[in-house]
Amino acid sequence: LQWDEWSKDAKGIFQGFRSDAGEEMILKKNLFIEAVLPGSILRDLNDEEMNEYRRPFQDEADRRPTLDWPRQIPLDNEPKAVVDIVQSYADWMEKNEIPKLFINAEPGAILVGSQRDFCRTWKNQTEVTVKGSHFIQEDSPHEIGEAIKEWLGLIPRKI
């Protein structure tokens, strides 16, 4: 994945997370929860829902994973160790015959364009499309549950 393939809406803030300013943005201001999360959901989260997302990240020290994770997304071949792992997984996913359910989001956010096209090349895959941006469980929970139920029913069972 290259920065020029990254969502225009998310590019600036994620570049900020990966810069020296990232610690202020995440650890002090909790921007992953306060900005990225609600900005990646089509509907508005209510106060009760937002408070539940905030709950694990009340203290600055508890926010470290929300800083480390954006810094580990493999972009422009960095960080190299993560790029290598993701590439090996991609190679494996492209070739294996394990049944897969691809829950596509429309309009989508990160998994769009060439990345989405690549996922569609995987063997033995069923695709469903639900309404959503990135955190699709918040926009289409029932549709996702129904898709999983239907897909599981299609998988042969060994007794």
Task: Enumerate the predicted regions with their spans.
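Conserved serine/cysteine hydrolase catalytic core
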Residues: 44, 61-121, 127
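Short glycine-/acidic-enriched loop or helix-start segments at secondary-structure transitions
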Residues: 6-8, 112-114, 147
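Flexible "cap/lid" loop of the alpha/beta hydrolase fold
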Residues: 1-33
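Helix-loop "lid/cap" segments that line or gate small-molecule binding pockets
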Residues: 33-45, 52-58, 72-78
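Nucleotide-sugar donor-binding loop of glycosyltransferases
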Residues: 1-2, 106, 131
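Non-transmembrane alpha-helical segments in soluble domains
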Residues: 37, 50-54, 67, 119, ...
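A short, basic/aromatic alpha-helical/loop segment that forms part
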Residues: 4, 109-110, 135-139
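Catalytic active-site module of serine/aspartate enzymes centered on a nucleophile-bearing elbow/loop
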Residues: 123-159
